[in-house]
């Protein structure tokens, strides 16, 4: 899908036209050496979700950087157009070109806007590590994405925490940034992966390329499994492992280091059944890429059969269209039908200030007794409500607002979260 061109100055304007619509540029989300990403919203359609505008070749980029930006755009566009339709891969809405001058085109991708990244989740975990529910959710979603793109012949080649983002609308993690991706058997990128998440064979290939030498073999989809193994180990341990995986100790016996990390965590919380995760991670981190477990096979790990429950921190950090309000109703309201109906109506009226409420549930019995579940039409309204309702006073009590998985809510599964 191609859009019409338009002219920009040194900074993007507040509004731009693409695909026959007017878009408002609201804020910059991030920038790198060859691209910047902005939050945009379609004007005249307040119900439409915001998007992410990825602009390659920012103003002032010339020479090798300009060539790299153009190359990255072509790589990412080709991969995303081929891989569209999978729930764990970022959605591409369209492609268009803007012009700073007649000879300086700037390519743009319009993508779905996603939420928190795994990198941010690791920061929030404060070196304690993520919950097993979070790790399982992330591992399954990323493996589903990898199984699909590997089946299509693609290698992502830059899997890292910053490139795994949560989708509030789809309630899953998604892969982004396919600028280094390549077709297996046709590796046209010399330097792949990010330091700390780079597979041994990619490390060797990069070193040879820097020395002007050609590698005998190309990297395969196994490099993505290595990266995921490191990511999962970081999520479990709460530690960045860049220096660990480059150490001589790791190269001598990585299995023993993984065992030590899991043993140390078990001392803190002996109730965590973590050995299946340990074995899964080990199967991804073989130095020999031919021994690494493929993504499709990894999805059959016993780790994914364990029914973990989320911690309350998980439900605060991962937005969904469903809001859960705690500390609102006490037993007196639940046991008096008239008072119960009055307070439920009051809560619904307050929640509707932030967007259309699809449904509202206040269970009188466990599980979920006294909790308020509010389903909004979209996650944007739910996020606004969560931000503004948390800490509010209701009937003399401070309200605690978390999100809640829409899939579980629809099934009537009101599990007890862990503190």
From Swiss-Prot:
Tissue spec: Widely expressed, with highest levels in skeletal muscle, kidney, placenta and peripheral blood leukocytes.
Domain of life (superkingdom): Eukaryota
Reaction(s) this enzyme catalyzes, per UniProt: L-seryl-[protein] + ATP = O-phospho-L-seryl-[protein] + ADP + H(+); L-threonyl-[protein] + ATP = O-phospho-L-threonyl-[protein] + ADP + H(+)
Compartments reported by the entry: Nucleus
Family: Belongs to the protein kinase superfamily. Ser/Thr protein kinase family.
Binding site for ATP: 29-37, 54
Gene Ontology molecular function terms on file: ATP binding; protein serine kinase activity; protein serine/threonine kinase activity; ribonucleoprotein complex binding; RNA binding
Listed PROSITE patterns: PROTEIN_KINASE_DOM, RRM
Alphabetical UniProt keywords: ATP-binding, Kinase, Nucleotide-binding, Nucleus, RNA-binding, Serine/threonine-protein kinase, Transferase
EC number annotated for this UniProt entry: 2.7.11.1
Main localization, broad class: nucleus
CDD domains: STKc_KIS (cd14020)
Enzyme class: transferase
Residues in Protein kinase domain copies: 23-304
Summary of subunit composition and partner proteins: Interacts with stathmin and CDKN1B/p27Kip1. Interacts with PAM.
InterPro entries: Kinase-like_dom_sf, Nucleotide-bd_a/b_plait_sf, Prot_kinase_dom, RBD_domain_sf, RRM_dom, UHMK1
Domain called RRM: residue spans: 324-406
Protein name in UniProt: Serine/threonine-protein kinase Kist
Natural source organism: Homo sapiens (Human)
